[in-house]
Amino acid sequence: MANISTSEMRSGSKVMVDGDPCAIIDNEHVKPGKGQAFNRIKLRNLKTGRVWERTFKSGDTLETADVMDTDMEYLYTDGEFWHFMAVDGSFEQHAADETAVGDTIKWLKEQEKYVVTLYNGAPLAVAAPNFIELEVKETDPGVKGDTANGGSKPAFLVTGAMVRVPLFINIGEVLRVDTRTGEYVSRATGK
């Protein structure tokens, strides 16, 4: 594997720390008034999800992690695993466990594309697209004139996610939702 210097590490870089693949969240270069410069690096363990900070001397190197982000289509869940298929034409399938799926579980929709992080051929993490279109399964009915005061109400989507929506949204409507914040963006167009 190739090595990467602390000065070359950027947010999103993948490195091996203590034998585990980690993603760099933040890299802060510190030059104290006295002593040698160092880098304070915030890391997230890709296997466990644990986040911590570690200090490295300026110029230290770490081994790059052999992780691969792959576009995959969500197929189904059997209750224990969530199954994904590669969209590159190989039809290769991978089963992700609950720790790999994590918070993305509430945005999983069949036949939708997701980014699956693979390490040694096993899924470590599943990331949802920034925006996804989902149908409203349950919400209070909209009443004529509700839009005047600009309030909101909870709506439960087909995946089980709860999103606050404007009062005029009804059951069966398809919404565009920001998966990063979990907020309603708009009604889906073309449906």
Curated annotation (Swiss-Prot):
Cellular location(s): Cytoplasm
InterPro entries with a match to the protein in the record: Elong-fact-P_C, NA-bd_OB-fold, Rib_uL2_dom2, Transl_elong_fac_P/YeiP, Transl_elong_KOW-like, Transl_elong_P/YeiP_cen, Transl_elong_P/YeiP_CS, Transl_elongation_fac_P
Post-translational modification, as annotated: May be beta-lysylated on the epsilon-amino group of Lys-34 by the combined action of EpmA and EpmB, and then hydroxylated on the C5 position of the same residue by EpmC (if this protein is present). Lysylation is critical for the stimulatory effect of EF-P on peptide-bond formation. The lysylation moiety may extend toward the peptidyltransferase center and stabilize the terminal 3-CCA end of the tRNA. Hydroxylation of the C5 position on Lys-34 may allow additional potential stabilizing hydrogen-bond interactions with the P-tRNA.
Entry keyword set: Cytoplasm, Elongation factor, Hydroxylation, Protein biosynthesis
GO BP of this protein: peptide biosynthetic process
GO cellular component: cytoplasm
PTM-bearing positions, type N6-(3,6-diaminohexanoyl)-5-hydroxylysine: K34
Main location: cytoplasm
Pathway this chain belongs to: Protein biosynthesis; polypeptide chain elongation
Highest taxon of the lineage: Bacteria
Classification via CDD domains: S1_EF-P_repeat_1 (cd04470), S1_EF-P_repeat_2 (cd05794)
SUPFAM superfamilies listed in its UniProt record: Nucleic acid-binding proteins, Translation proteins SH3-like domain
Single Gene Ontology MF annotation: translation elongation factor activity
Family indicated by similarity: Belongs to the elongation factor P family.
Function: Involved in peptide bond synthesis. Alleviates ribosome stalling that occurs when 3 or more consecutive Pro residues or the sequence PPG is present in a protein, possibly by augmenting the peptidyl transferase activity of the ribosome. Modification of Lys-34 is required for alleviation.
HAMAP family assigned to the protein according to its UniProt record, in alphabetical order: EF_P
Name the record gives this protein: Elongation factor P
Species name: Marinomonas sp. (strain MWYL1)
